Amino acid sequence: MKNFYNVYRQNLVEQDLPTIYCDMDMVLCDFLKGAEKELGKPFPEVDKDKRWPIIHKNKTFWENLEWMPGAKRLWSFVNKYDAHILSAYSTNDSNSIPGKMKWLRKNAKLTQRSRIHLVLRKQKQDFAMTNNKPNVLIDDHLKNIKEWEAKGGIGIHHLSVSTSLNELKKLGYK
């Protein structure tokens, strides 16, 4: 028989965990693979002035990106804690926001708009704290992590699914 005190304490600790914010591109979905498919060669090899107009022409680019390897496992883990999506949208692509929303609905089965935050990159740091309590950001872009931490949040620089999961477990997520 379970000890009521231990069950109560475990629930109290789990309820007090920081809110998780998870990036999309290169954390959940494979932007670079999709871009290479669209451009015909790796994204960094195409001139900046040429690559974005080509990507923007494809109205379904964002919604048809593939999962990153292992990312379904990461999403399954963080989704147990009602994780939020915090992703930057492309300012010059009117398909970016609706495409990311469709991707989330179709792939992550996420329909709660209150858990989806599609913002300008520099606005991500504004979600670092809630009521003077730090939140967690999982993001592949180190600049975002540094800005997040400077605002008081807990940053997890996403290098692989296993390292991100290990960092979350160190914070008390099971």
Feature annotation, model-predicted:
Residues 13-174:
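Catalytic phosphate/metal-binding cores of nucleic-acid and nucleotide-processing enzymes, i.e., regions
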Residues 2-15:
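Proteolytic processing junctions in secreted/extracellular precursors
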